[in-house]
């Protein structure tokens, strides 16, 4: 991608001053939002393992190149420690966040990434998937399909039980669908994956008392009939999270997400069970001796929230054994930390700038675009993308461990990410030209452009707090837009407040900086579709509808055809720009040298019940 002269000198100006503010490290801007299904991404789950030697090279750290940049290709995703495990033991997991976790601790109701970092320890999907994101028969349930692919028959293993000893049943699996499809459901899950089930829309609209396409065959067997057969059905579109009917069955659906069964006494069938909760701060888990994969090696896991500003000290002292993620801007100065092994993967996530283009119609269950919105002019959106230099941001803020985003399908899905699509290059001169030609002129002489109608233009920009880098990075974007004559007013908000306001289409937000965790299935419908609650831009377009539908059509079983469709969709979104990606990202996780059998990413076959330690106490850094 061509870089203008301004890109090369930026470090001596605005960006250099921001770097000076962050020289002591810090975190990026908070967590990632989630998409329309827990197994469809957004949670960035970590299931990891460890190396052993204290030598930096042997501990998974790769030296930076001569340019001071690191590459995610130099990291492994499974620990390599070969020490002997002790009996039992306890580990401490740090949930890295500058805010409390919200506490909606059930896959059927949660919406924020911090909550899923808690849930993953005590609950899990009934189906697992391989490194290509295809469902396997190695999980708590197995599946078969009819010859035409429209009917799935699921069988839950006999030894899969809730933590209270009750069996996980087909009725529980059906019940989850009934709750999510209910008109009073207040969570974010209901969307295209559910409306594709035969009879779901009739049930949701109150025209039927049952979902005709879901049948309980026996206690452990469930059959679901889907309306449209697509490759997504085996890569993420099946809802694989049951809901314990013996606990929730007598509750009103509208009361479930705020109930003690979600907030104080959550239940699952995973390797650990919840022993105690300090709301928003910490959770103590004890092992589930009857876990279906086998009794866990560890006796206990302690999860506590760790501020990004103190995560290094916690790791060095052995206060935590491993963390949800590590602020990559702090990696260079800690790459040789002697008591940890560094794991890394290309994250299924990206940061982005979103433009508010409409509102959510709750009654109709769809997004509605509004041509009168402040950011409705695509020429204004084009100029704002051209005005920011994310290549330099990735290099200078993150030493290459975040890099310029080009399309809305990240490289975590290499078979569908279009490497030939360069997005929109950094070119402030072109940005100025676009605004000039579109009629945005400085009428009043105050240095800021007015609208083509001569009215004042103030763009309200919301971004998340989250450590030392969050605000300077957001201010870099503001200053970049000011350099092309746009008056942008920045508001920094903590994670929960930020998403409350963005979800509610608050009138005080015109643009926002968010982060998406994408699904195991590449299908972007859950993030950018007409009926997707998580489509926070509220963008709709018939061509967008068509391309998203083509991507999950029967023709899309041909992977080459599907890739072609998604290449076309990526290019379409580069032209339409309801949002633009800013950075793709590496996910780095340091793991204490005493930890055995931990892995991050997908399809590695290492599970949390295998997690073990070689010593009673965590190793401290030298």
Describe these PLM feature segments.
Residues 3-4, 131, 157-186, 271-397, ...:
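Extracytoplasmic/periplasmic ligand-capture domains
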Residues 189-250:
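Surface-exposed binding/hinge segments that line
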Residues 1-10:
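Bacterial Sec-dependent N-terminal signal peptides
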Residues 20-23:
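C-terminal motif of bacterial Sec signal peptides marking the signal peptidase cleavage site
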Residues 73-77, 91-147, 267:
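N-terminal lobe/hinge region of extracytoplasmic solute-binding protein
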Residues 25-70:
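Short, low-complexity, disordered segments immediately C-terminal to signal peptides
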């Amino acid at each position: 991608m061509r870089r203008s002269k301004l890109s090369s000198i930026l470090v001596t100006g605005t960006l250099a001053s921001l770097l000076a503010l962050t020289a002591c490290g810090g975190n990026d801007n908070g967590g990632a939002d989630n998409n329309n299904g827990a197994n469809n991404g957004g949670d960035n789950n970590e299931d990891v393992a460890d190396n052993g030697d204290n030598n930096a090279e042997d501990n998974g750290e790769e030296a930076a190149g001569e340019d001071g940049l690191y590459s995610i290709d130099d990291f492994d995703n499974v620990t390599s420690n070969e020490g002997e495990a002790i009996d039992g033991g306890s580990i401490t997991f740090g949930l890295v966040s500058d805010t409390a976790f919200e506490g909606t601790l059930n896959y059927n109701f949660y919406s924020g990434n911090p909550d899923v970092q808690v849930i993953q320890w005590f609950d899990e999907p009934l189906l697992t998937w391989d490194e290509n994101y295809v469902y396997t028969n190695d999980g708590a349930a197995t599946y078969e399909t009819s010859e035409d692919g429209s009917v799935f028959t699921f069988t839950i293993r006999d030894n899969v039980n809730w933590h209270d000893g009750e069996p996980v049943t087909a009725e529980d699996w059906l019940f989850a669908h009934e709750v999510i499809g209910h008109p009073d459901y207040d969570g974010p899950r209901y969307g295209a994956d559910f409306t594709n089930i035969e009879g779901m829309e009739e049930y949701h609209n109150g025209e039927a008392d049952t979902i005709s396409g879901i049948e309980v065959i026996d206690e452990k067997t469930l059959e679901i009939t889907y309306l449209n057969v697509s490759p997504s059905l085996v890569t993420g579109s099946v809802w694989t999270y049951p809901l314990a009917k013996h606990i929730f069955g007598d509750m009103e659906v509208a009361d479930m997400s705020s109930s003690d069964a979600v907030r104080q006494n959550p239940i699952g069938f995973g390797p650990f069970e919840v022993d105690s909760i300090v709301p928003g701060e910490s959770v103590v888990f004890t092992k589930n001796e009857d876990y279906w994969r086998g009794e866990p090696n560890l006796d206990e896991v302690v999860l506590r929230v760790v501020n990004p500003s103190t995560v290094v000290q916690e790791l060095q002292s052995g206060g935590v054994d491993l963390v949800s993620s590590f602020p990559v801007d702090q990696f260079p100065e800690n790459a040789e930390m002697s008591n940890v092994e560094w794991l890394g993967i290309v994250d299924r996530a990206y940061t982005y700038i979103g433009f508010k283009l409409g509102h959510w119609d709750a009654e109709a269950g769809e997004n509605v675009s509004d041509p009168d919105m402040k950011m409705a002019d695509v020429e204004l959106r084009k100029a704002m993308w051209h005005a920011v230099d994310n290549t330099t941001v990735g290099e200078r803020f993150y030493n290459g461990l975040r890099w310029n985003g080009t399309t809305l399908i990240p490289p975590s899905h290499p078979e569908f990410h279009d490497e030939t699509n360069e997005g929109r290059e950094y070119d402030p001169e072109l940005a100025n030209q676009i605004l000039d030609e579109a009629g945005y002129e400085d009428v009043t002489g105050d240095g800021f452009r007015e609208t083509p109608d001569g009215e004042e233009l103030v763009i309200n920009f919301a971004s998340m707090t989250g450590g030392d880098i969050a605000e300077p990075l957001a201010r870099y974007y503001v200053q970049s837009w000011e350099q092309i004559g746009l008056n942008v007013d920045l508001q920094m908000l903590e994670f929960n407040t930020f998403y409350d306001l963005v979800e509610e289409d608050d009138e005080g937000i015109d643009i926002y900086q968010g982060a998406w965790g994408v699904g195991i299935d590449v299908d972007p419908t859950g993030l950018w579709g007409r009926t997707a609650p998580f489509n926070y831009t509220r963008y709709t377009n018939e061509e967008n509808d068509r391309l998203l539908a083509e991507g999950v059509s029967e023709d899309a079983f041909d992977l080459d055809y599907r890739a072609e469709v998604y290449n076309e969709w990526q290019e379409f979104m580069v032209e339409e720009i309801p949002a633009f990606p800013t950075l793709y990202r590496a996910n780095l996780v340091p793991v204490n040298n005493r930890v055995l059998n931990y892995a991050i990413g997908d399809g590695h076959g290492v599970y949390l019940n295998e997690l073990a330690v070689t010593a009673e106490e965590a190793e401290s850094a030298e």
